[in-house]
Design a protein with these regions (language model features):
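Histidine-anchored nucleotide/phosphate-binding helix
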Residues: 1-6
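Acidic donor-binding segment of Leloir-type glycosyltransferases
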Residues: 7-82
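Catalytic-site signature of metal-activated, phosphate-bearing donor transferases
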Residues: 55-110, 114, 119-268
Length: 268
């Protein structure tokens, strides 16, 4: 979906993946194993594989290329070397994506958009860049949807980050991710489609990412109920609201509702 939505407004898709989750479990290289399914986009995809995610990060105490110095504090005042190893892995994996951007041949003036796979910036923003100031960095405030394309979460999501390659390569990708309070915010700038799939997909997502505090029996045992009833995946108080598919959605989604019918809930 995101490739179709953004194909006409980007030069390259830099796709970074690893054979390990940040929890340390082995996982497939999904793009590499399904490359034939991406035939339309393969000429635009720059694939970067982080072959190994360390268990010990003491060799990164001092700053190295594209990586932060792990002796420094995170935004909450904890030295990064003292964080749980799953967070250190996530930090490493995210920052390592910059090598893929370098591989794509980015120049200092190029606009670089960094996103999680489930974050899609609005392509209309990229058709006219008069608003973009190369001295600034930006965050796209996105509408968030869980389970279904039209199960709307009632708080915006801080999604894709935008800046020049010159700016990004002299900081780190994770720093841009964490410093969204300092970024210039672009309102209604995209979509965050997350926790899509069935009950097993729900559980796999929670088992794979760094926030293992959410991977509890209390959360996962009610996965099916949450999906069916539109309840917050992590047990927060906000209930999801079913909304109509209208012109606030990507044109590609509106034109392919039959293709995504299983992910659309009736709103009438």
């Amino acid at each position: 979906m995101r490739l179709n939505i953004l194909n006409d407004v980007v030069d390259y898709f830099v796709l970074t993946e690893s054979p390990f989750t940040v929890s340390g479990n082995e996982k497939p290289l999904y793009y590499q194993e399904n490359k034939d399914r991406f035939g339309k986009f393969n000429d635009k995809i720059v694939h970067h594989v982080t072959e190994e995610i360390p268990n010990d990060f003491t060799h990164l105490l001092e700053k190295t290329k594209f990586h932060v110095a792990y002796k420094n504090n995170d935004p909450y005042g904890t030295p990064m070397i003292d964080l749980p190893v799953r967070f250190q892995r996530a930090l490493f994996n995210r920052n390592n994506s910059a090598f893929g951007i370098e591989k794509a041949g980015a120049t200092d003036e190029d606009l670089v958009i960094t996103s999680d796979a489930d974050e899609i910036i609005n392509p209309l923003l990229l058709q006219d860049l008069e608003w973009f100031n190369p001295s600034n960095h930006y965050v796209a405030e996105c509408r968030a949807f869980y389970y279904k394309l039209n199960f709307l979460y009632q708080e915006d999501w801080m999604g894709s980050r935008l800046c020049t390659w010159k700016h990004l390569k002299n900081t780190t990708i994770d720093q841009h991710r964490q410093d969204h309070q300092k970024a210039h915010k672009i309102q209604d700038a995209g979509w965050h489609f997350s926790f899509f799939g069935n009950e097993e997909d729900f559980k796999l997502k929670l088992a794979s990412y760094e926030h293992t505090e959410n991977n509890t029996d209390q959360v996962t045992s009610t996965a099916s109920e949450k999906i069916e009833q539109g309840l917050d995946p992590l047990g927060r108080t906000n209930k999801l609201v079913t909304v109509p598919l209208d012109d606030s959605y990507p044109q590609y989604v509106l034109e392919n509702q039959d293709k995504y019918a299983e992910f659309i809930s009736a709103w009438n």
